[in-house]
Amino acid sequence: MPSTPHRALRALLALCTAAGLASVAAPVAHAAPGAGPTAVVTMGDSYISGEAGRWLGNSLTNSGSRNGTDRAWTGSTYDPSRVYGSTAGGCDRSDTAEVKSAGPIASSLINLACSGATTENVFRASQGGQAYKGEAPQADQLAAVAAANDVKLIALSIGGNDLGFADIISTCASDYIVWYSYCHDDQQAVVDAKIDGVMADVGRSVDEIRAVMTAAGYAAGDYRIVLQSYPSPIPRSADNRYGESGWSRTNTGGCPFWNADSDWARDSLVPQIADRLKGVAAAKGVQFLDLRDALQGREVCAKASRQVTSTVPPSAATSEWARWIDSQSTQGLVQESMHPNAYGQQALGKCLALINAVPTGNRSCRNTAGTGTSGMYLTAN
C-alpha cells in the first residue's frame, strides 16, 4: 500500500474506467423450449459477472501469490485468464461468479453479465440496446440461450453503473484522501436526481427479458426472473477495525472513507437502492433477492474479518469477502475494487442456489458469523 495520497488518488480515479474486449458468444443450435438442457442464466453488471473473482481475501504482500490470495499466480507470473478466461480485463466473468458457484442447480450455468454494463447493454439492439466490450446486447444473447436450452431461472443485477456507483466510490475516497471533506451530502443529491430514471430502465430491462423469452416460445410459468440488489463492500464505522484518523484506512486497510460516509453508504445508499429495486420487482411481478446484508462482517476493513498474511492463510471463515481499493495499483486491476471477491461470489452463489429452491416470494440472504460460504441463509423479505 502507498505512503502518499497522490498515488492513491491516481488509482481511485481509474475506478470509473473499464478496459478490454470480450469474445462474442458462438452461434448455438435452436430447440423448442423445454427440449434442451435446463439452464440458469445470470445477466447484468460486475456484481454478478464475477469481477474480483481473482482474489481470496486481501494481502499487503505485493509479490508472488500475495500470501495465497492471488489466484492468477502461475508460479512465475500472473495470468488473469486463469480466473476470467477470455473475458479477462473486459467483462471479467470469473470461474467463481455467482452462477458458477451455485452448484448443480441446472445442467447449464450461463453467465451473460459483463463488468461495467448498464441497462442499455441489456436491452435488445432492436429496442435501442447497445453492444458492449465486443458483445451483443445481453437480451440478444439471451435469445440464443433460450432457443438452445430450457431456461428455468434468470437472475439480473443491474442499475449500479447507471447510477454511477464507481464515481461515487471514487469521489468518497478522494474526499477522504485529498480534500478532507465528506461526500455523502453531494452524492446523495446525485443519486436522488438519477434514481427514478434508472429504476425505470431496470424495469424496462425486465420487460426486455420477458419479450425475449416470449418470442422464444416460453410461457410465463416456464421460467422465473429474480432481480437482485447489491451487497455493501464496506462496513459501518462502528464495525471498521481502523480508526478514521491517520493513513491506516488508505495504506493498510484499503477502505479510505470517513465514518460519516461509510455509514451513509452502508445504511442509506445501499438500502435506498435495494428498496427501489424491490419496488421494481413488485411492479414487474418478479422475485427479489435482497443482498444488502450478504457481506455483513466480511466487508473490507470489517472487525470480524482479517487480512491474509504469511501466518494467517486465506479462509472463507476469516478473510474479507470483498476486494479492497489497491491504491498503489500493484495488484490486479483497479476495476476489481469494491466487488465481492472469490469468497464473496461463492457466498452469493449459495444465495442463488437457495432462492432457486424457493419458487415464490422475496428473500434476503445473509451469512452466519464465523462460518464459511456454506453458512448463507435466506429470510423472508
PLM feature segments, named:
Residues 63-197:
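Conserved SGNH/GDSL esterase-like catalytic core that processes O-acyl groups on lipids
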Residues 46-50, 114-120, 160-165, 231-235, ...:
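Solvent-exposed loop/turn segments at secondary-structure junctions
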Residues 232-339:
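Mobile gating loops/cap/lid regions near enzyme active sites that modulate substrate access
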Residues 1-32:
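Secretory targeting and sorting signals
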Residues 38-55, 60-61, 66, 70, ...:
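Catalytic nucleophile-elbow at a beta strand-turn-alpha helix junction centered on a G-D-S/GDSL motif
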Residues 317-374:
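Histidine-centered active-site loop/cap adjacent to the catalytic His
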Residues 98-109, 198-225, 266-291:
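A structural motif corresponding to the C-terminal end of an alpha-helix
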Residues 34, 50-56, 121-124, 165-170, ...:
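Short, solvent-exposed loop/turn and secondary-structure capping segments
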